[in-house]
């Protein structure tokens, strides 16, 4: 399993902590935060690694929409690849921190740019109401939130259903799909 993350710290830290907690064999799961921080770069990096290295039966590309101009192209590129059942897009709109916020509250409030803040910065402000010490790249976030992971999964699934009904993706996250997949690996 290869997990390629847009972020070099926050997302890789979270998934490394999850893999560690589940006691999954790290020889079989590689978490890569070395791509450039754009959705298109994440997808290109993941495809390159998959083509150059053998042994990856699943490849997850973890990236945010926030205000990235290459988001839609990356989603389309992966949709074309998903027919192989190898590549999966794990998107968050507007950002990964929305997944973290769902550990505390259910919200489908759309996040938009204001004069002072990007959509992602608005999510960060909401998250800090519940997790005041959080900052990008924080360590041990998974362990802090672990007791609420099942709640976050339910919130994420519900938000996705509501977003589909409302024909929007703001806000949504697919991180629950990767968390559920990794949990299933532990039980297989």
Regions found by a protein language model. Name each.
Residues 2, 12, 16-33, 51-58, ...:
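C-terminal accessory helical subdomains adjacent to catalytic cores in phosphodiester-
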Residues 45-51:
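Short amphipathic alpha-helix with an adjacent loop that forms part of the alpha/beta core around
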Residues 1-7:
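Short, extreme N-terminal leader segments that mark the start of a protein/domain
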Residues 35-45:
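Short phosphate-binding loop-to-helix
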């Amino acid at each position: 399993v290869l997990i390629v993350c847009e972020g070099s710290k926050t997302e890789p830290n979270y998934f490394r902590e999850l893999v560690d907690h589940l006691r999954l064999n790290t020889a079989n799961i590689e978490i890569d935060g070395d791509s450039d921080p754009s959705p298109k770069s994440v997808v290109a990096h993941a495809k390159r690694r998959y083509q150059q290295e053998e042994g990856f039966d699943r490849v997850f590309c973890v990236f945010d929409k926030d205000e990235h101009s290459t988001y839609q192209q990356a989603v389309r590129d992966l949709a074309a690849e998903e027919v192989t059942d190898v590549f999966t897009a794990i998107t968050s709109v507007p950002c990964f921190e929305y997944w973290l916020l769902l550990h505390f509250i259910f919200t489908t409030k759309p996040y938009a740019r204001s004069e002072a803040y990007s959509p992602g910065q608005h999510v960060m402000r909401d998250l800090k109401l519940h997790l005041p010490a959080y900052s990008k790249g924080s360590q041990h976030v998974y362990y802090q939130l672990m007791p609420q992971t099942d709640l976050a999964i339910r919130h994420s699934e519900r938000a996705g259903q509501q977003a589909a009904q409302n024909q929007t993706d703001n806000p949504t996250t697919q991180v629950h799909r990767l968390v559920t997949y990794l949990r299933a690996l532990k039980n297989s």
